[in-house]
Amino acid sequence: MSTVITSIDPHSPAERAGITVGEQLLEINGHHIVDVLDYRFYGYDPVAVLRLAKDGQERTVTVRKEEGRDLGLNFPTYLMDEMHQCANHCLFCFVDQMPPHMRPSLYIKDDDERLSFLLGNYTTLTNLSEREAQRIIDLHISPINVSVHATDPQLHCTLLGNKGAERSLEYIRRFCQAGIVMNGQIVVCPGWNDGDQLRRTLRDLTEWQFSSCSLVPVGITKYRKGLARLRPVEKDCAREIITIAEEFGQENLRRYGTRRFFCADELFLRAGLPLPEEDYYEGYRQIENGVGMLRSLEQEFLSAMKLEEPDAAPSPFTIATGTAAAPFMTHLLEQARAYFPALRGQVIAVENDFIGHTIDVA
């Protein structure tokens, strides 16, 4: 933990209050400051009383500002603490399937609830302490993005490669009861958490009133030597996943007004099924997980296209994309050609020789 101030934003409330670099932030409004969540939450109010220390001397400074405005303090790290590293050994971990000799940041496995809230990273909650869990409830830290994968405790532990992973399911239940908004994901691995196990997971999440959850197919690269044997989601499996998700989605729509469960675009592409209409995505609440990216792109593309004159003749172009998205991009190009008769362009599907042909999205 490091709450020593390293810099202060110019013209910020903290600068106006006379706070100086090198002081350590101990408390805000009587609350002990451990990390960035404490700093953000307790520093939100228009009046912030800061207890500071430097060279063995303490002082109190009152900062007045607009509600919600940042105090303007900066610390050695973004989190003001060490990042929580992943303690799991997931059967499907994509980082474990990376090629060697890449840049170091590609091999970092974070599993930090603070990064989930602040940056949208996904967390399994398996390394969450009781204090951290209770803080999420007490401060109503929401939304957070949670990797669920399965609600059968034994299967959950197996998929995450962590004998103690069951406690994360208890955290999920507690957070649901406390009204914490959670966006979840299920990485579907054929033969593991599909079929009846998937039904159980969706049934449990419905019962717990989990906010929303995306279903995505497992990604398998050509670098799986020494790892658990997995098989990709193929056409029939993708169709079954979509059918199960739709069954529970329709039930949730009838009972709660939200479908709750959303299938990634990649599943529809693998299933050979048309993408859902825009209202399926409920405002694209799971778009960061590949749910609705193509439909959103199409809507934005068509809207932008109609702002141009039909006789426009842009320079010739080529769109390079993965093999999965190539048919859809070709579909967009055909719509553009119908509107711009002089348009000259092509779509090129690129095989992923680098990490494996089974990684075909772009």
Per-range role (PLM):
Residues 56-58, 67-208, 219-248:
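Conserved Radical SAM active-site core
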Residues 16-34:
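Conserved PDZ fold ligand-binding element
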Residues 239-321, 339:
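Hard-cation-handling environments
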Residues 37-51, 66-68:
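Short, compositionally biased
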Residues 14, 22-25, 50, 93:
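Terminal peptide-recognition signature
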Residues 192, 209-236, 256-278, 352-359:
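Flexible glycine/acidic-rich beta-alpha junction loops that bind and position SAM and/or redox cofactors
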Residues 31-39, 59-61:
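Short, Lys/Arg- and Gly-enriched loop/turn segments at beta-strand edges
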Residues 307-362:
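Redox- and metal-dependent alpha/beta enzyme cores, enriched for Fe-S-associated oxidoreductases
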